[in-house]
Amino acid sequence: METLLGGLLAFGMAFAVVDACPKYCVCQNLSESLGTLCPSKGLLFVPPDIDRRTVELRLGGNFIIHIGRQDFANMTGLVDLTLSRNTISHIQPFSFLDLESLRSLHLDSNRLPSLGEDTLRGLVNLQHLIVNNNQLGGIADDAFEDFLLTLEDLDLSYNNLHGLPWDSVRRMVNLHQLSLDHNLLDHIAEGTFADLQKLARLDLTSNRLQKLPPDPIFARSQASLLTATPFAPPLSFSFGGNPLHCNCELLWLRRLERDDDLETCGSPGSLKGRYFWHIREEEFVCEPPLITQHTHKLLVLEGQAATLKCKAIGDPSPLIHWVAPDDRLVGNSSRTAVYDNGTLDILITTSQDSGPFTCIAANAAGEATATVEVSIVQLPHLSNSTSRMAPPKSRLSDITGSSKTSRGGGGSGAGEPPKSTPERAVLVSDVTTTSALVKWSVSKSAPRVKMYQLQYNCSDDEVLIYRMIPASNKAFVVNNLVSGTGYDLCVLAMWDDTATTLTATNIVGCAQFFTKADYPQCQSMHSQILGGTMILVIGGIIVATLLVFIVILMVRYKVCNHDTPGKMAAATVSNVYSQTNGSQPPPLGGIPVGQLPQAPPKVVVRNELMDFSTSLARACDSSSSSSLGSGEAAGLGRGPWRLPPPAPRPKPSLDRLMGAFASLDLKSQRKEELLDSRTPAGRGAGTSSRGHHSDREPLLGPPATRARSLLPLPLEGKAKRSHSFDMGDFAAAAAAVPGGYSPPRRVSNIWTKRSLSVNGMLLPFEESDLVGARGTFGSSEWVMESTV
């Protein structure tokens, strides 16, 4: 019976095991171990029905994306876990916490971006960790903390690693293989491989390493090494594909005996591209450091930050250190910070920082130094209110003692608070929107003041502003204030205390004041409006002045050239037609002989009309008549026409000047006529001399006359003009008289008008007619004639 029950129980257990195998998986029950094989089954996640007693689990070649904490829970007996060739991008922390028996973990060919601190937590017996061909960009410092002493094989190749937790690698004392090839490593910490005595394979191929730290482990990679022990096996070392900087720092590596590697140099330029093992040792050289730039002197106010700069060059790049004035090596602390580029920042300066700071630049070839002189301006420290009440040992109260004494007899009493006394020693005046004048006074018995310090801050801001003032000044103008704001201001005195060898300070006094309000927008608008108004006013004044000036000129012109009504009524003029313009004279029928036509006389010159005043003609006639004898004047007075009384003498003008010249010419001609009339021979000669005028000779007189010398005449090559008399209708009337025309006996008496013409001729008139016509031509006009 017992045998039957045992058989049934064994059959049930076997059936249960077979039934627990996941779908699409193969479960093998080999003696005491159970293996679950699910490779390349298209799984999207870890099957939840996996037997928790599984020893070997293979899930490679699937499409698993995420690993959770429940996927491998309670699999304490799992020894080998393969998750290769999936698309795993995230592993939840503590997902492998129950895999305490796991020896081998394969996570290669996935998409893991990083390994966190708790990603591999719980793998206390892990020996093989394969994480190659991922996208690892960083590994946490404690990611390998649980299996540092048990790990034998670590493969991190074909990732994007810029660095490793080298401290953790240093403690992997049982490590046999370390694959770090095809990454972005550019630095290996010195002493990383010092304790890896069991390391048999080290692959650093295809990284960005420029140098390797010297380590005794690399001596086991020499080809001549024949002795090997299980505790110190030969080292297979590969570091090809790195841009090695072949200088004196790699001279130790060059001295190793290797004959089968093809490493090349990446720098310097003289060795670039050459095989590392073919370069002579003499060519591995370095350059000593040279400081190219540094701070020389620095003046800093106590309590403020200070920056000291020091730059150096060399091969290899030198390291820069700073030494304080007390020969102390300056490092990173809460008050100082040293950067890789050689800059030293002192965040808060003290009096102990005053002195020379030394910059030391050192490399494998030597060192260089430079000194930076730092001067700290010590600030006086404000004492509390309780210390002001009792006089200190340095007699600080003497500064304000005078103010107390001066007001001691004022009846204020001894009960007045002592703190109110120093406040009255400071006076603020001349307060504007952005400035204020501060004045203070101290007693003569006070110690010798070294310097004054002015402290003030805005009532809306807690920032305290300091101003250092020489001891010789007792007033100071505070500028750059904010308008419409209250300020608290205190004046402190500082001097050297001989007892403590420190700077002693005390408050001289305090005051409060408000700056005036400012309205910049309104003020600017007012100035703009005022400026525009001034421009308009000035422009209006200029325009009005110009208008008045123009009106005055017009009125003056009209007054000077206006003819009076009496003269216009008395004057009779006649139309004169040029002898060469082709016009016909008007008919003379009905006009009696000796009667003047009622037409204004004109002289035509180049089609330009120019009227001369009547006074000019009268002045010419009066000057001509005055040269005659008294008998002739009496004869003219008895004529049928009487001349009106002479007009007032006109103002000097061009017309008057020309008339004067004409009068002088006529006067000379009249004298010659008088001489000719007295002698018969002379009369005939005079008649003949004036009766033949050519077209080229002016009628005003011979070429040598004074009028001709003043009036410019055309030359031979130009149109010829002559000066002639134009008597208007007198010529026509004389022509109508039977008997033809006779030359005038006295030409000067009929010079009432002048005409410029090409063919001038002398018109015949009797002397009696001219005397009567003189009253008619009271006003004359000049007409310019066009010539053909």
Curated annotation (Swiss-Prot):
It is found in: Membrane; Synapse; Postsynaptic cell membrane. One of its GO terms (cellular component) is presynapse. Predominantly expressed in the brain, with a weak, but broad expression in the cerebral cortex and diencephalic nuclei. Strongly expressed in both the pyramidal layer and the dentate gyrus of the hippocampus. Also detected in other parts of the central nervous system, including the olfactory bulb, pons, cerebellum, and medulla oblongata, as well as in the peripheral nervous system, such as the ganglia of cranial nerves and the dorsal root ganglion during gestation. Its main location: membrane. Residues 1-20 form the signal peptide. Residues 620-631 have a biased composition (Low complexity). Keywords: Cell membrane, Disulfide bond, Glycoprotein, Immunoglobulin domain, Leucine-rich repeat, Membrane, Postsynaptic cell membrane, Repeat, Signal, Synapse, Transmembrane, Transmembrane helix. Gene3D superfamilies: Immunoglobulins, Ribonuclease Inhibitor. GO terms for biological process: modulation of chemical synaptic transmission; regulation of postsynapse organization. The chain crosses the membrane at residues 535-555. Pfam families: fn3, I-set, LRR_8. LRR repeats lie at residues 53-74, 77-98, 101-122, 125-146, 150-171, 174-195, 198-219. InterPro entries: Cys-rich_flank_reg_C (IPR000483), FN3_dom (IPR003961), FN3_sf (IPR036116), Ig-like_dom (IPR007110), Ig-like_dom_sf (IPR036179), Ig-like_fold (IPR013783), Ig_I-set (IPR013098), Ig_sub (IPR003599). Glycans are attached at residues 29, 332, 341, 384. A motif (PDZ-binding) lies at residues 785-788. Forms heteromeric complexes with LRFN1, LRFN3, LRFN4 and LRFN5. Can form homomeric complexes, but not across cell junctions. Interacts with DLG4. Directly interacts with DLG1, DLG2 and DLG3. Directly interacts with 2 NMDA receptor subunits GRIN1 and GRIN2A. The PDZ-binding motif is required for cell surface expression, neurite outgrowth promotion and interaction with DLG1, DLG3 and DLG4. Promotes neurite outgrowth in hippocampal neurons. Enhances the cell surface expression of 2 NMDA receptor subunits GRIN1 and GRIN2A. May play a role in redistributing DLG4 to the cell periphery. Belongs to the LRFN family. This is Leucine-rich repeat and fibronectin type-III domain-containing protein 2. It comes from Mus musculus (Mouse).
